[in-house]
Amino acid sequence: MFRQLKKNLVATLIAALALGQVAPAFADPADTLPDMGTSAGSTLSIGQEMQMGDFYVRQLRGSAPLINDPLLVQYINALGMRLVSHADSVKTPFHFFLINNDEINAFAFFGGNVVLHSALFRYADNESQLASVMAHEISHVTQRHLARAMEDQKRSAPLTWVGALGSILLAMASPQAGMAALTGTLAGTRQGMISFTQQNEQEADRIGIQVLQRAGFDPQAMPSFLEKLLDQARYSTRPPEILLTHPLPESRLADARNRANQMRPVVVQSSADFYFAKARALGMYNSGRNQLTSDLLDQWSKGNVRQQHAAQYGRALQAMEASKYDEARKTLQPLLSAEPNNAWYLDLATDIDLGQKRANDAINRLKNARDLRVNPVLQLNLANAYLQGGQPKAAETILNRYTFSHKDDGNGWDLLAQAEAALNNRDQELAARAESYALAGRLDQAISLLSSASAQAKLGSQQQARYDARIDQLRQLQERFKPYTKM
């Protein structure tokens, strides 16, 4: 429908801190250290973890090149929650994010937040491999590895974590300065962190592979993906320095393979959604380089029915991205005729309609589909089509409902702000934009916008009272976040 990519963040800094890297490390033999053991993770309560998670998610939204594509976000969250439903010791809600980055990586941090790099779609051969990475990261969260690491560092180097967290924030404003600060902070404790990390990685593998099996995926996917990473490490000439803190020794691969071999062999087919998501991620994202190659599409064309449909969808997507709308429509039409309620097809058909200035066609198509199957992605598409078609009031009606039930989706607030602007509802436009700023961690700007909205609202009105109450809420949030902004 639409893409909103934001400023770059050195996300690997968070990955190093969160102990959740899936990429292999290049370490010399001396990096294989004795087991340091684990602590009880008593540094943070669950409530504190969630509060810190909220703070860092907002920073991530405001600085990272997040992919806010509604279809891809819906897919990775559905896949992630399928895995979470089969995990033990789940104490927080989970949220899954996708970053536009061509380096293989994933990381987990406070409060059940898991971030995937878009490159994973390029390297994962099947859905089970992608799920294996997510199960590994989910296990970092359920085992509270970050809290346990903070407890360990509290004893051995109490200032390290404060400095590292502060360096992450610095990196959001100045990547080079942030990297230098983080390198200096961690230099004195590198050996201890490597040892602790290796133990966490093995534990996340062990628990993650159990989650993978329970959720109905192929447990062999975990060792097969680890082996792919190790092979890439062997043949790479200039590995990223950050990988030095995340060793992937042969013993870790062997342990994962042994555990998978003890489980009952299964044949698991990747879902159609996996192939559609892979085509979309490779065709529209991956750091601006189209990696939806002809070779891959030709390979899918010779595969099973799901792969064949994904190949045709991918070709239609490529044509649409190249503004070849007639070709895109012709390629997509057989798929859409066979499955008129398929969200992937409907979304692409909407983009084609809007690209050809046929907003009414998009509106009629989406209204019919939405009546059959209520889907948040299609609601956003319909609201966007109404806006493009000059019907902001209809868009406003949809978006008021949408933002009420999806308060953390910046797409909804951004579209609502556009609708209110078109309707000349200045105070409501400012309030909607304020919510977008708040989600991105820009609380001062959000409060300023809400103050302006309150000043423009009718004196003593319910709207004014609502804006003032929201200002109070955001000020309270600022107070709760103060300890983290000082790091």
Swiss-Prot record:
**What ranges cover the TPR repeats?**
309-342, 427-460
Localization, per the record, is: Periplasm
Tell me the residue numbers annotated for binding Zn(2+): 136, 140, 201
Please name the gene that encodes this protein: bepA
Query: Which residues does the Swiss-Prot or TrEMBL record annotate as the active site?
Result: 137, 205 (proton donor)
Top enzyme class of this protein? hydrolase
Q: Which UniProt keywords apply?
A: Hydrolase, Metal-binding, Metalloprotease, Periplasm, Protease, Repeat, Signal, TPR repeat, Zinc
Its EC number is 3.4.-.-
User: Out of the domains of life, which is the source?
Assistant: Bacteria
The GO cellular component terms are:
membrane; periplasmic space
This protein's species is Salmonella typhimurium (strain LT2 / SGSC1412 / ATCC 700720)
Q: Mind listing the GO biological process terms from this record?
A: chaperone-mediated protein folding; proteolysis involved in protein catabolic process
Annotated GO molecular function terms are: metalloendopeptidase activity; zinc ion binding
> Which CDD domains does this one have?
M48C_bepA_like (cd07333)
UniProt main location, coarse: periplasm
Q: How is the cofactor bound?
A: Binds 1 zinc ion per subunit.
Q: What does this protein do?
A: Functions both as a chaperone and a metalloprotease. Maintains the integrity of the outer membrane by promoting either the assembly or the elimination of outer membrane proteins, depending on their folding state.
Q: Which family does it belong to?
A: Belongs to the peptidase M48 family. BepA subfamily.
What this protein is called in its record is Beta-barrel assembly-enhancing protease
Q: Which cofactor does it need?
A: Zn(2+)
